[in-house]
Structures are given as structure tokens and as C-alpha cells.
Curated annotation (Swiss-Prot):
Gene3D superfamilies from the UniProt entry: Zn-binding ribosomal proteins
Gene name for this UniProt entry: crp-6
ZnF bounds (C4-type): 37-59
Protein name in UniProt: Small ribosomal subunit protein eS27
GO MF annotation: an example: structural constituent of ribosome
Species in which this protein is naturally found: Neurospora crassa (strain ATCC 24698 / 74-OR23-1A / CBS 708.71 / DSM 1257 / FGSC 987)
Length: 82
């Protein structure tokens, strides 16, 4: 019996659609990012799934707020993945 799908060599597109625990090689989906404050342009390192409010050290502006999963960036903040 021949399978239509190769289970040992899945395509990257099919691996991206799977749940994080069902992938062939488990990998985390969280990351650290550099967030730039829109007011004073200070860069702060923030975890993508932060569970507390992150405030800018320079001007005390809220950079991101926690949700149930990923943290929501404040409007106007730009970020870069590390």
C-alpha cells in the first residue's frame, strides 16, 4: 500500500500549518524583539508573549499590553525580530 503523502519528508507549507506539538521537529513559536518607542525612539527588548505591560524607560509610554497569547504592540511602535 502506497501513501499519497510522504510522512518522513513533509513540505514546509504543511509543517507551518500544523499545531506546534504535532510538527516533526518541535520548535518554539515565541521570540524576542526590539521595540522602538514612537516618542523618544528608544529601543527596548521585549518577549513576544509578554505577560506584563512593558513601559519605555525614557518617556514611560506603554509599548505593549498582554493578551491571552502574544503581546499586543501599541499603535505607532515598530519592532524587529531578534
Amino acid at each position: 500500500m502506497v501513501l499519497a503523502v510522504d510522512l518522513l519528508n513533509p513540505s514546509p507549507a504543511s509543517e507551518a500549518r500544523k499545531h506546534k506539538l504535532k510538527t516533526l521537529v518541535p520548535a518554539p513559536r515565541s521570540f524576542f524583539m526590539d521595540v522602538k518607542c514612537p516618542g523618544c525612539f528608544t529601543i527596548t527588548t521585549v518577549f513576544s508573549h509578554a505577560q506584563t505591560v512593558v513601559i519605555c524607560q525614557g518617556c514611560t509610554t506603554v509599548l505593549c499590553q498582554p493578551t491571552g497569547g502574544k503581546a499586543r504592540l501599541t499603535e505607532g511602535c515598530s519592532f524587529r525580530r531578534k
